[in-house]
Regions:
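Acidic, polar-rich low-complexity tracts and alpha-helical solenoid repeat scaffolds
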Residues: 2-575
C-alpha cells in the first residue's frame, strides 16, 4: 500500500549571465515507516506485522473481555496492554483509523512499563499522520512532548519525538518540525537520530534553508537504508541543485538505488530527468521522464514528467512526439494546472496540420470543461475560426457550429455561404432554408434582410405561399428602412392573396398606393393585385375599378402583355 502527495514542480529561469534553475513545489513522498522499538515481552509478533498480514491479524487477534469497575489493577493493565497491542497491530497492517480508535482508549493510561507508553504514543501519532489527520497529530504531539521537557533522552522517547516531528513536517509547519527533530539530533543516538536528521533535511528544504538541508541530508546517509536513505539522497540532490551545484545534484540522483517504493522511485527518475534537462542533456532527460510515464503512470508525478517531456519535444520541433505525449498527459491528468495549456497546444498542432476536427475537439474540451481557465475565451475564439473553415465543407459541422456558438457572426456567414453555394448549384429550396435560418437566427446581422428577401423570393417563385408570407412579414416587421422593403410588402400582399387572406392583402396594397414615390409601373402592378384581392372577396365594383385603372397604366407603358392579362381578369368579373 503506497501513497504520494501530488507533486508540483516549477522551473524558474532567471537571467544572471547564465541560466539558473530552482526546483520548487517538491514534497517528500509518504512512506509508511513502522519503527521496531526494541524488545518488549509479548510484542515481537505485533512489531513485525506488515500490510500483507492484515487479514490474518484481524481474524486471529482476540481481545479479552473488558474488566468490570471492581477489577484489580493487574487485570485492567492486562486488558489495556492487549488493547494497545491490537491498536498498534491495526496500524502496522495499514488500518490506520481503526488503530487510532483503539489506541485513543489507552494513550493516556499510566502503564507500569513506560516502554509500552512510548510504543502507544509513537504509533498513535503515526496512525493520525498516515490517515491524513496532521493537525490532530500535531496537537497530541505537543502534549506528549511537554511530558518529556527537561527529562533525559531515551530511545522510546526519541521515537515519540520523531513522530511528533513528522506530524509537523507533513502538516506544513517546517520550522517547528526542525526544532522538534533537534532534540533527537542533539541528544539522541541510533536509527531514530538519523531519521530525525533526514526529516530535518526536508524541513529545511521546505523552509528554503538549502545549506542546512544539505548538511543534515549528508550526515544521516551512512546509517540509513532503503526508502529513508533514498529520501535523504533526494533531499541532498535538491539542496545541491538549488545551491547552484547542478552537476553535483546529477551525480547524487545517478547513484540513488531503486527501493521498490513506487512514489520514491518515480520521484528519483523525475528529478534525475529534470536535472539532465537543466544541463541541456535532453535525450537523457527524456529517457527518465519516459520511465516515469511508463512505469508509474498511476502516480501524479507521471503527469509532471509528461508535461516536461512534451515541452522538450516542442523545443526540438519533434511535433509527432510532442503530440502523442500531450494526448497521454491530458487524457490522464485533466485536473493538472497545465492541462488547459496542453490542450490548447495540442489543438494548435492539429490546426497547423490542417486536421481541423481534432483541433476543434481539444479546443472544445477547454471551453466545455474549464470555464474559469484563462484560455477559455481564446479557445472559443479559435474554435469559431476553425468552425468557419469546416462549416463550409460539411453541413454537419455547420449545425454543430450553430449549436455551440448560436450568436457567432462566423456561423451566420457560413449559412450565407451555403445558401449561395446551393443557389449556384440550382438547389433553390435548400438554399432558401439556409437563407431563412440565417435571417431568422441572426436578425442583427448586416446581411439578414438580404438573406430573408432571397429566401422569400425562392418561396414565392415556387408558390410556397405560407412560407413566403412568413418570410416577407419578417422583413416588413423587422426592417422598415430596408431598401427592398416596398418590394417585400408587394410580395407579401400577393402571397397573402394566394394563401387565402385577401383582406390582409388589400390593407397592405391600399397603403402602398398612398406612397408618393410610386412610378406608373409600380402603381399598375399594385392596382392589378388589388383588383385580384377584391375579386377574391366578391367586391366586383372595387375589383373592376382597380383593374381598369391598371389596364390604362399598362397601355400607357406599352406593356401589352399585361393589358391582355388584365383583360382576362376582367372577363371573370361581373358588372
Amino acid at each position: 500500500m503506497f501513497w504520494v502527495f501530488i507533486l508540483q514542480v516549477e522551473e524558474e529561469e532567471v537571467v544572471t549571465g547564465k541560466a539558473e534553475y530552482q526546483i520548487t513545489g517538491y514534497k517528500r513522498p509518504v512512506y509508511f515507516y513502522m519503527p521496531d522499538m526494541g524488545d518488549l515481552v509479548g510484542w515481537n509478533d505485533i512489531l513485525r506485522l506488515k500490510f500483507e498480514d492484515s487479514l490474518s491479524f484481524v481474524n486471529s487477534f482476540s481481545l479479552p473481555q473488558k474488566p468490570g469497575k471492581k477489577a484489580k489493577k493487574e487485570e485492567l493493565e492486562n486488558y489495556y496492554t492487549k488493547l494497545a497491542m491490537y491498536g498498534v497491530g491495526l496500524i502496522r497492517v495499514g488500518l490506520f483509523k481503526e488503530g487510532v480508535k483503539s489506541l485513543s482508549e489507552v494513550v493516556d493510561y499510566a502503564f507500569s512499563k513506560p516502554e509500552i507508553s512510548y510504543v502507544i504514543r509513537t504509533y498513535f501519532l503515526l496512525g493520525l499522520i498516515y490517515s491524513g489527520d496532521y493537525e490532530k497529530a500535531r496537537s497530541y504531539g505537543s502534549i506528549f512532548l511537554s511530558d518529556y521537557y527537561n527529562r533525559p533522552w531515551n530511545s522510546g522517547m526519541g521515537w515519540v519525538i520523531w513522530a511528533a516531528g513528522e506530524a509537523n513536517l507533513y502538516g506544513g509547519h517546517f520550522l517547528q518540525a526542525e526544532s522538534i527533530y533537534a532534540k533527537n539530533i542533539n541528544e539522541g543516538e541510533g536509527l531514530v537520530r538519523e531519521l530525525s536528521r533526514m526529516g530535518s533535511a526536508w524541513a529545511n528544504l521546505y523552509a528554503q534553508k538549502f545549506s542546512d538541508a544539505l548538511s543534515q541530508a549528508q550526515n544521516c546517509q551512512n546509517y540509513l537504508n532503503g526508502v529513508p536513505l533514498s529520501h535523504a539522497q533526494i533531499a541532498e540532490a535538491i539542496a545541491k541543485f538549488n545551491l547552484g551545484d547542478i552537476e553535483g545534484a546529477k551525480e547524487v540522483f545517478d547513484r540513488i538505488s531503486l527501493t521498490g517504493h513506487p512514489p520514491t522511485d518515480a520521484m528519483v527518475y523525475y528529478y534525475r530527468g529534470f536535472t539532465y534537462e537543466a544541463l541541456r542533456l535532453y535525450e537523457i532527460a527524456l529517457q527518465n521522464y519516459q520511465k516515469v510515464m511508463q512505469d508509474y503512470a498511476n502516480l501524479p508525478i507521471s503527469g509532471e514528467a509528461a508535461y516536461r517531456a512534451y515541452n522538450i519535444y516542442l523545443g526540438q520541433n519533434k511535433v509527432e512526439e510532442a503530440k502523442n505525449t500531450i494526448i497521454w498527459f491530458v487524457d490522464r491528468f485533466p485536473q493538472h494546472p497545465e492541462a488547459t495549456r496542453a490542450l490548447y497546444t495540442l489543438a494548435e498542432i492539429y490546426f497547423s496540420q490542417k486536421d481541423y476536427k481534432n483541433a476543434l475537439s481539444y479546443l472544445r474540451r477547454i471551453y466545455q470543461n474549464y470555464p474559469n481557465s484563462e484560455l477559455y475565451s481564446v479557445a472559443r475564439q479559435r474554435a469559431q475560426q476553425i468552425y468557419n473553415v469546416i462549416a463550409r465543407e460539411d453541413t454537419i459541422e455547420l449545425w454543430n457550429f450553430l449549436r455551440e456558438f448560436p450568436n457567432s457572426e462566423e456561423a451566420a456567414d457560413a449559412l450565407i455561404y451555403w445558401g449561395g453555394k446551393l443557389l449556384d448549384e440550382g438547389n433553390d429550396m435548400a438554399a432558401a432554408r439556409f437563407y431563412y435560418k440565417m435571417g431568422s437566427e441572426f436578425p442583427k446581422h448586416r446581411q439578414a434582410p438580404d438573406a430573408l428577401f432571397t429566401s422569400g423570393q425562392i418561396y414565392f417563385k415556387n408558390k410556397m405561399w405560407k412560407d413566403a408570407v412568413q418570410t416577407f412579414k419578417k422583413i416588413v416587421d423587422l426592417y422598415p428602412r430596408y431598401n427592398e422593403v416596398n418590394k417585400a410588402k408587394f410580395f407579401l400582399a400577393i402571397s397573402l392573396i394566394y394563401d387565402g387572406k385577401p383582406v390582409e392583402a388589400i390593407r397592405i396594397l391600399r397603403a402602398e398606393l398612398s406612397r408618393q414615390d410610386l412610378d406608373d409601373k409600380e402603381r399598375a402592378d399594385i392596382l392589378k393585385y388589388l383588383g385580384v384581392a377584391y375579386k377574391e372577396i366578391g367586391k366586383s365594383y372595387e375589383a373592376r375599378n382597380a383593374l381598369e385603372e391598371a389596364r390604362v397604366l399598362y397601355f400607357g407603358l406599352g406593356r401589352l402583355d399585361e393589358v391582355d392579362n388584365v383583360d382576362k381578369l376582367l372577363q371573370d368579373i361581373p358588372y
